[in-house]
């Protein structure tokens, strides 16, 4: 394993926090974005982890707020000629792979993902070459180049079902890049999985000691956990699942107070789903200067109103997502396998 990229020791180029806007500035950019979306025949596709004001704007303009799987479905099926993807770069790449005829814009092309950064394609190719007998399954949180090497792409919402299916066929798996999700899936399915050792900086910061203290303070609360979290956090959960699955769990659990261990961006849609329940952030490893993400992805936070307006107004190379056509065609194969498999689960 010494030749593998080590995400635990990597120093990620964290972006600066966006400059806060005044109330008047927010109103100005909101109206400008609404006008530009109409003029550009564009629609917004926003992830649950973007800031609440971005999700609200996507709702108001007929766009989509969802996890990465539904973002992929929505963008491919929507008649708009331009997709404004509010998320991180791999989401924009995925939109372009599935909709090559459309213009894909992002507020910034520098919105990274620690899972993507932690799985460089050269190192990953060497890892796969060393294990040619294994089926390669990669999480959606990867670059187009890594997807192009894969047999399957998967999201957390269907990970257990897909690996269970492959295991039933007797296939041995390479799983990348999230080690925590890989271990969770392995434990649920019993499959033979060899994990790449990546991690999400947000979920990796949840720690049992701090969560136990919060649980003791609110003993009547249920704990909801995303499986990108460490195993010890998952073991404390009343419900484990993807973003959309956690929102569904919030509605079905009888508890009136919920401790949520995932990016706090999810609170916007979760609170809509359970307006009468109290939502509490699961504590991260540190506070202030000692935590890296503080339960909110710093790259998701780059999707601000001003940046969205500029992307729609200026377009061009600073905002438009491009994927090499040969790479796109290769990455499309495992993505379509994922979408086809997901369709069978929906019946």
From Swiss-Prot:
[4Fe-4S] cluster binds at residues 113, 200, 297. This is Quinolinate synthase. It catalyses: iminosuccinate + dihydroxyacetone phosphate = quinolinate + phosphate + 2 H2O + H(+). It comes from the Bacteria. Its EC number is 2.5.1.72. Gene3D superfamilies: NadA-like. It comes from Escherichia coli O157:H7. Catalyzes the condensation of iminoaspartate with dihydroxyacetone phosphate to form quinolinate. GO terms for biological process: 'de novo' NAD biosynthetic process from L-aspartate.
């Amino acid at each position: 394993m010494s030749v593998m990229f080590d995400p635990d020791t990597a120093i990620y180029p964290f972006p600066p926090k966006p400059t806060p806007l005044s109330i008047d500035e927010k109103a100005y950019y909101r109206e400008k974005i609404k006008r530009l979306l109409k003029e550009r025949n564009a629609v917004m596709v926003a992830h649950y982890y973007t800031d609440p004001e971005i999700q609200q704007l996507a709702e108001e303009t007929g766009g989509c707020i969802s996890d990465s799987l539904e973002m992929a479905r929505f963008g491919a099926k929507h008649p708009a000629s331009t997709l404004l993807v509010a998320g991180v770069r791999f989401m924009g790449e995925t939109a372009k792979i599935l909709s090559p005829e459309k213009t894909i814009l992002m507020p910034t092309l520098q919105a990274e993902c620690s899972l993507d950064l932690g799985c460089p394609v050269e190192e990953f190719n060497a890892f796969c070459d060393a294990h040619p007998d294994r089926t390669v399954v990669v999480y959606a949180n990867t670059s187009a180049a890594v997807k192009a090497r894969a047999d399957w792409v998967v999201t957390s919402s269907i990970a257990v079902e897909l690996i269970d299916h492959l295991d039933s066929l007797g296939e041995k798996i390479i799983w990348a890049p999230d080690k925590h999700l890989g271990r969770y899936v392995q434990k649920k399915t019993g499959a033979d999985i060899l994990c790449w050792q990546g991690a999400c900086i947000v979920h990796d910061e949840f720690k049992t000691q701090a969560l136990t203290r919060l649980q003791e303070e609110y003993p009547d609360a249920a704990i909801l956990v995303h499986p990108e979290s460490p195993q010890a956090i998952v073991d404390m959960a009343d419900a484990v699942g993807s973003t959309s699955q956690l929102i569904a769990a919030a509605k079905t659990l009888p508890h009136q107070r919920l401790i949520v261990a995932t990016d706090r961006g999810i609170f916007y849609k979760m609170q809509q789903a359970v307006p009468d329940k109290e939502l509490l952030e699961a504590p991260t490893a540190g506070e202030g200067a000692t935590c890296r993400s503080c339960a909110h992805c710093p790259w998701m936070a780059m999707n601000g109103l001003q940046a969205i307006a500029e992307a729609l107004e200026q377009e061009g190379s600073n905002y438009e997502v491009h994927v090499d056509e040969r790479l796109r065609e290769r990455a499309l194969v495992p993505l379509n396998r994922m979408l086809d498999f997901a369709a069978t689960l929906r019946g």
